[in-house]
Amino acid sequence: MFDEKINYCILHNNPDENFINKIGSIPVVKDLEFNKLVERLEFFPNKQVIFNETLYGLKLDEKMEIFKLLKKQNISYVNVTSNVEDALYSDYIFVYDGNKLVLEGNRNEVLKEEKTLKRLGYGLPFVVDLSIQLNYYDIFNKVYYDLDELVRALWN
């Protein structure tokens, strides 16, 4: 179901065990604190992993370290989360309302669906929302998905 070369995000406001089990036979990692998660991923035998709200409580620098480690270990991921900010780090996004698939597509396509995301209670990631607002004032003519890139553009 999931391509081993693509990182996915599943936005779901209340995934239960049945939902997670339907995803497939990919190993699920959940409820690990940062150091234990790093330790587990360093010797992870599989090429794919499912995070079930695992990244939600991590600080941004910890998430970046996890993503760097995953890339180094050549492990792709499916991140099941209720945090729309985590969608920024995925290539492909599925958005669910209960057990109903509402949106699906690459990151740019899904994050353009502002009204639908807000209706479902997600809103937009901060950097995306800010860059859209700056577009209204003709400061930019594109949407940014990376805060560092947005800051560099503001300084130029």
Regions found by a protein language model. Name each.
Residues 2-26:
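Glycine-rich P-loop/Walker A and Walker A-like loops and their local beta1-loop-alpha1 context
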Residues 54-56:
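Short loop immediately C-terminal to the Walker-B catalytic DE motif
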Residues 59-62:
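Short alpha-helix in the ABC/ABC-like ATPase nucleotide-binding domain
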Residues 81-85, 98:
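The feature captures the ABC ATPase H-loop/switch
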Residues 88-95:
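Conserved catalytic segment of ABC-fold P-loop ATPases
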Residues 100-128:
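Conserved beta-strand-loop-alpha-helix hinge in the C-terminal portion
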